[in-house]
Amino acid sequence: MSVKSVSIKKWWLPVVLALLVVASGALAGSLYWTQYRPDTQTDAAAERTVIDAASAGAVALLSYSPDTLDKDFSAAKSHLTGDFLTYYSQFSQQIVAPAAKQRGVKTTASVVQSAVSELRPESAVVLLFIDQETRSTERPQPTLAASSVRVSMAKSGGNWLISKFDPI
């Protein structure tokens, strides 16, 4: 064995060990930022906050009275974001408002059960089970309806807002 091959072997081992230490550190850092850190932002308190926001938004969306439509629609819009806000603005003015005024439709919704399906630091999906009572001038006796809704939530400016509202 020559002197040259012995010096290369002595030099190579510390370099490989140093690279393994750096790679292990990079892997640990990556796992912290992608796995552990998001988990700390989605604890039980975050789950309760997103359920409360989804429930309040759903009740605001599904509860209105012909006497207070503008106030009711404004309250509902404060819980919405993105394309769903645009859709709801058009739908509420073009479909709901004329029908509510013409027929005197009044609806009241309440959330009876809820569960978080997905929770990430900036988005969530909540399942809501809703009871809705509807009255109108044509039907003064309340009509009760039960429904379930998949509510997609997005965090915007520190607040959870509804980005999708899909009946199941």
Residue ranges of predicted features:
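Amphipathic, hydrophobic N-terminal targeting peptides for secretion and organelle import
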Residues: M1-T42
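Short acidic/polar alpha-helix capping motifs at helix-coil junctions
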Residues: V21-G25, T34-Q41, L61-L62, K77-L80, ...
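Surface-exposed, charged secondary-structure patches
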Residues: K101-R135
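Periplasmic/lumenal scaffold domains of single-pass inner-membrane subunits
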Residues: S136-Q141
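Short beta-strand edge/turn micro-motifs at domain boundaries
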Residues: A146-I168
